[in-house]
Amino acid sequence: MRLWQWSIAVAICLVMVTEARLRRHHRKRRFVSSNFDEFYCGESAHAQSQFEEERESNSSKVSSVHSTQFNWGLDNTICIKLQNVVHVLKYERLEQRYPIENSYTFSVPLIDTNCKCHCYGFGTNDVCNVEKYADDRNCTTSSEFPTCYTKYHPAVEPLDCPVTSIPAKACCDIKLKPRDGRMFRAVKLQQPINDMIISHSIFANNSGKMMKVLGPDEFRINLLKGKEQFELTEYHRISVQLVASSPQQQLREGMYYFPEENHNDLREGKINEITESDLDKLGWYRRVGNDWQVATSGLLLRNAHKVVIKNCKGQVHMDQFSGTKNFVLRGTQYNDTYNERRVSDNNFVRSVKVDESSREITIVHEHGTAAQVSLKTDTRPNLTKSQSLLANFTGSITLDHDGNRMLNVTFFGVKGTVHIKMYVNDRKLIATFACTAQFGTSLKDDGSRISLPSTINQAQWVCILPDEQPTKSEICKWIPYEEKAMRTPRQEQSWSKGHSPCSQAECNSLKSGVSDLFPWIMNFDYFMAHGGDFTEWLKIGIHIVIAVGLLLLLILLFTKCLVPLACCSLSIPFKNRNKKKKKKNSSDY
């Protein structure tokens, strides 16, 4: 063979070898960094070791075991490659399951009152008969108001009564119904059961592309013991040892409630337990079977009722329920923002699910709890980690109404793990706070709420760096600080004005007179009872004009008619002084 033929053959061999190497390198790079659309690898091993142990409990055979340790965070993944297969373990979520001890249905009531006043000593028909309105009697209910109680007030101000030296008496019907037809469910929660849910998936290299061949299979790990061990046996044998503690952030044990039209809208506040009937808390107006009731046959509500009679004959009154909250009295507004704090507003709550059929409420934790994982395999695994990215971020630091100090951050173009550090100024001498956040497998815009210590009370220089990226990739900016005022509990219900129409024959049995026909002219009590708007002041002005006119008319009548008539009847000369003076002047001539 000639020299040039040898040269061509050698060149062809070199080209083939180079192409094969490039092909192998290309496949390897595709697995390591570029082809993670199907899965994401976020955790790096912090330790690897090899030792000998008996893998089979019924065998004395000793084999070589490879152990790999990881620190594992919520929403993150661990990837190990054994031969041509990639095992992916993902920390899916942390669930807190709260058993429901007991429950009841309640409503915020709308209350209306019908009060009648009876003047002492007038009328044979006593509408405020003590036997009829005794405190242990219920009044007639209706389809509109399913609950009704009576209240007898033996001594009230006798305004507009003929006898004002003796107190009048008032009798009231207190009617209740669910406000806007809305009903709520109160539940008592016990201490939670904490479960860590992880998933296992398997990917295999098929013609240079990673394809899912198994999973995801979920495993529920109870954190009560703090340690768990199990095995994965598909394709390869992997022994998993997991150590994790229960999260510190959880709902307190006690009473919660939710609207019946939205079970997952769990709320917290001052709520009566099933054995309580405190009018200062939610849940004192309850449904028992098909009836709506106030505990103790409404005795507490009756005792809380206060009434002021503004006009006994006009049946005008003002009333309120002292020491009672969480109701709507006729003509008043109900402000429920202070009691209706949603559980989902807590920074550690990702979602809420209420399942009354299983008597359980599940909270998916926002932060999770850190775990230490040890994977034992028969062969040494190849480890890989995906690239973390961050395009930009914005945020704010807030001290909210309830005293929670939070860093609210919106991340743009984020994937994987990012490290957050906060400084007093841009010199970055000492970090005031540091944490890590995970954002899963795909590039996205996402937000996060992070609890901060009480030492942070001003604007901060915040720097965020994607995991395992050079320092030049760090993004820093000033984040403003904002304080919101503390919540102020709503004030007790104000007085509400009511009018109870009553026929003359039924109430007080007084004959109609000028005062009844024209109460705005002759009755100041009516004016005081109905308020002092422009119309009432106009009426009182007309009253004054008429009174002045009547006074002038009486003066004229007295001086021009009554006095001369009296003088004439008593034979007393009554002559005008001007006439006497004129007569005297004429005699001088």
UniProtKB/Swiss-Prot annotation:
Keywords: Cell membrane, Developmental protein, Glycoprotein, Membrane, Signal, Transmembrane, Transmembrane helix. Disruption phenotype: Egg laying defective phenotype. AC fail to fuse in the majority of worms. RNAi-mediated knockdown in a daf-7 e1372 mutant background causes a severe defect in amphid sheath cell fusion induced by entry into dauer stage. The chain crosses the membrane at residues 538-558. Expressed in amphid sheath cells. Glycans are attached at residues 58, 138, 205, 335, 382, 392, 408. Residues 559-589 are cytoplasmic. Residues 1-20 form the signal peptide. GO terms for cellular component: apical plasma membrane; cell-cell contact zone; intracellular organelle; plasma membrane. The keyword Transmembrane helix applies. GO terms for biological process: regulation of egg-laying behavior; syncytium formation by plasma membrane fusion. It is found in: Cell membrane; Apical cell membrane. It is a single-pass type I membrane protein. It holds the Pfam family EFF-AFF. InterPro entries: Fusogen_EFF/AFF, Fusogen_EFF/AFF_dom3. Residues 21-537 are extracellular. Belongs to the EFF/AFF cell fusogen family. Required for cell fusion events during development including the fusion of anchor cells (AC), vulval A and vulval D rings, and late epidermal seam cells. Required for amphid sheath cell fusion induced by entry into dauer stage. This is Cell fusion protein aff-1. It comes from Caenorhabditis elegans. The gene is aff-1.
